[in-house]
Amino acid sequence: KAQGWDTAIETTAYGTDEAIEAVIPYVDLVLMDCKSTDPEVHKRVTGVSNEKIRKNAAKIVKIANRVIIRVPTIPTVNAFEEEFHRIAEFAKSLGVDTVHVLPYHTLGESKYEMLGKAYTMGYEIKSLPRDEAEVFRQVVLSHGLNCVVGG
């Protein structure tokens, strides 16, 4: 940063206050995941409720220079128009103006294998077609936010 480099961090926002306060002030861009607005769905998919994440997200946007919410769009989990309406409202409530729709893919499987962990998303989940991702982009745009597929 001192040498003029732009800095960014990608986070789930599931961390301690100390970590947020130690890192976020020095970052130009925070790319923050949002897997589900529903605490039960989030817990089923990730193993933790999103309550702490939502609180941390509010802290992060107060400290960060810029935040973009990124939605790994997973069929059977959050690939529903209603959920994208809720995500857009969540982004607006935080003062975040940009959402990235990230179509689900299975490229993360190899990371799990390298770490010796089980890939719990399941092999039966298929990648999200681009035209479906475009529907979700249009939902976010309808809330007056910026939105791209990918990012």
Regions found by a protein language model. Give the residues of each.
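Acidic carboxylate-rich catalytic motifs and surrounding loops in phosphoryl-/glycosyl-chemistry enzymes
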Residues: V148-G151
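Conserved AdoMet/S-adenosylmethionine-binding subsite of the radical SAM
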Residues: K1-G108, E113-M114
